[in-house]
Structure formats: C-alpha cells, structure tokens
C-alpha cells in the first residue's frame, strides 16, 4: 500500500515538475518571440552622427568616474586611469566601480549576481554598489560596458534596452553627467577573425545596435564611446607590422599567461591594461597621452609589469591618433596621422 502511494506521489511530482519546466520554457519562448516581433526603437545613423557633431569641452579638473562592468574592467585598469590623470595634473581624479564575472548590463540592473563571483570581483577598496552610486549624484562620468560575446548579449540580454535604463538612471540624478560606453573586444581565438570582429563590431553592434537603441530613449541624451577595441586593433597592426618591439612581440603578449603556459585569449595582463587605461584617459580628459608615465601601481599597491619605453611610446601614439579620429569619443577630430 505504501509502495503504491509512494509511486503515485512520485508520478505526480514528476508531472508537476514537467509542467513547470514546460511553463518556464514557454515563458522564455514567448519573451524571445515578443522581442523578435517587437524590436526596440533605434536612432538612424544620421541621427546618431548629429549627436556627435559638437565635441565635448575638456574637463578642467579631475573627474569622479564610476565604472560598471566585468573582468575586462577589473580592479586595476580604473586605478591606472586615475594615476595617469593625476600625473597629467588632475589631482582630484577618483573612481568607484561595480564588477561582475562576465556580467551583462541586464544582470547588473536586476542584481542577478552569483554571490561568489560578485564577492570575488568586488574585494577592492573602490567598490560601491551601482544603484547607490548613481543616485548619490557624486560622479562626473559614468563608464559602462556589456558582456561578450556581444551578439549573444544583444540577443538574449537586451543590451540596448538595459544600456538605456542605466543611462537614463544616471541622467535622472546627474543631468550633466557624461556617459560613456566602453567598447571592449572578443577572444583572440574567435572563429570570424579577431581583427575583423574588432573593426566590424563598432558600427554594427556597439554603436549601431546598443547605442542606437539606448539613445532612442528621450531621457538618455548622448552617450559617447571609449574605443578600446579600435585602439587595440590599430596598435596590434602597428606592432606586428614592425615585427614586435622590446618586451612585446605580438598581440598575444597583451594577455595573461595561464597556469598551463598558454595565453588567455581575452583577459589582459598589465601591459594590455595600460593600453586600455590610456584610451580611457584620453577620451575622458582629452589629454595627449604621449610622454605620460608607463610604470604604474596595481589596485593592491604592487608595481605593475610596465611596458618597455618603446612599447609605451607606440601605445600612446596610437591612442592619441585613434581617439581623435572617431567623433563618438567627444574629442575634436583630427584627420591627420599622428600629428600634435
């Protein structure tokens, strides 16, 4: 009798579990179909270009910057930006951040963080919860980025809509705050080709999808771009065309070494972080980075593995050239090649 009843209970539980799974899948499918049939509003390329016709004014003082992202932000790179800004005379530069491990803008917004990874990524002293930080109205610039693979993020995590939510949230509490989307990169092992994706994704995905959707909201205004991916592509082409430089032979030398002796395809070492920090500095402050220090400190106070003087010089030259060639950075445009 008990065995028979147990079987009936087990069968019912399986039935309910199956029904629950079907219901969950049905909801997910419904959301997907709704998004496919009701795409978000987007700005045309002409409307986006019009937003960037007038450059931003260079900041007159050190900026308070808030960074939202994942491991391609990390605890070290924002600190490099602060040190470089201070070396350039902006003593008041400071920052806070909230990071996740491969976290999307949607997951940050909904606070859907796996506890272990969220705690691991935010042990640094500059952590401050994102919603609290933006509501405080204590920041001059808000820099945010999306997870990669970017195509998956756009399709499954509604990148443009959540970029718009974050931007509108920041604007609500600080109308004059400068907003920046930090363009990152995919792994060097990506099937479509690393340089091809870097050079194609800026217009197609970062600007043409994420920003076009985000800036279609009337409460967002202009979001500028920190073009780290474009700089990385240009730097790698320049570096490899010269056959490498002291301390850096090719693109792979920008990425961390894994325990098995192979290079991580996406996470930067100190040299790569320095390059990305230069892009942030130049975009945020309109500063010519040439001649700035290349020996910096990590977030834990230890000395970073500095690029050689030759590598640092090429990085600085490429950053200054590329950032001034893209209207979305907010800098006055220079159509020359590497001039002063």
Each language-model region and where it sits:
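N-terminal Sec-pathway targeting helices
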Residues: 6-24
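Structured segments of extracytoplasmic/periplasmic soluble domains
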Residues: 71, 75, 80-91, 145, ...
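Alpha-helical cap/lid subdomain in secreted, periplasmic
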Residues: 128-270, 282
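Acidic/histidine-rich, surface-exposed loop or edge segments in extracytoplasmic proteins
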Residues: 59-67, 140-151, 301
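Hydrophobic alpha-helical membrane-insertion segments, chiefly the h-region
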Residues: 24-34
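Conserved SGNH/GDSL esterase-like catalytic core that processes O-acyl groups on lipids
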Residues: 75-161
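Conserved catalytic region of serine esterases and O-acyltransferases that act on ester linkages
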Residues: 32-34, 249-340
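Serine-esterase "nucleophile elbow" of acetyl-processing enzymes
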Residues: 37-102
């Amino acid at each position: 009798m008990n065995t028979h009843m147990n079987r009936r209970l087990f069968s019912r539980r399986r039935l309910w579990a199956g029904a629950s799974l079907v219901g969950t899948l049905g909801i997910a499918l419904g959301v997907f179909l709704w998004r496919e049939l009701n795409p978000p509003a987007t700005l045309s390329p002409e409307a986006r270009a019009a937003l960037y016709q007038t450059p931003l004014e260079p900041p007159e003082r050190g900026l308070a910057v808030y960074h939202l992202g994942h491991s391609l932000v990390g605890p070290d790179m924002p600190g490099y930006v602060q040190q470089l800004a201070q070396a350039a005379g902006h003593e008041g530069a400071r920052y806070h951040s909230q990071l996740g491990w491969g976290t999307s803008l949607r997951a940050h917004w909904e606070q859907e963080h796996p506890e272990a990874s969220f705690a691991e990524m935010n042990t640094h002293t500059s952590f401050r919860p994102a919603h609290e930080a933006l509501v405080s109205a204590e920041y001059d610039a808000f820099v945010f980025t999306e997870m990669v693979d970017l195509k998956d993020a756009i399709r499954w995590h509604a990148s443009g809509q959540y970029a718009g939510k974050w931007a509108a949230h920041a604007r609500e509490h600080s109308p004059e705050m400068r907003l920046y989307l930090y363009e990152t990169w995919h792994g060097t092992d990506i099937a479509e080709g690393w340089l091809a994706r870097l050079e194609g994704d800026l217009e197609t995905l970062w600007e043409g999808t994420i920003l076009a959707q985000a800036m279609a909201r009337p409460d967002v205004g202009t979001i500028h771009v920190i073009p780290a991916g474009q700089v990385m592509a240009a730097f790698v082409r320049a570096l490899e065309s010269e056959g490498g430089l002291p301390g850096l032979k090719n693109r792979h030398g920008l990425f961390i070494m894994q325990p098995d002796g192979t290079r991580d395809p996406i996470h930067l070492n100190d040299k790569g972080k320095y390059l990305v920090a230069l892009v942030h500095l130049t975009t945020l402050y309109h500063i010519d980075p040439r001649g700035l220090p290349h020996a910096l400190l990590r977030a834990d106070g230890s000395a970073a593995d500095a690029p050689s003087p030759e590598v640092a010089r090429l990085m600085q030259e490429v950053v200054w050239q590329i950032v001034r060639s893209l209207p979305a950075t907010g800098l006055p445009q220079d159509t020359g090649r590497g001039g002063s």
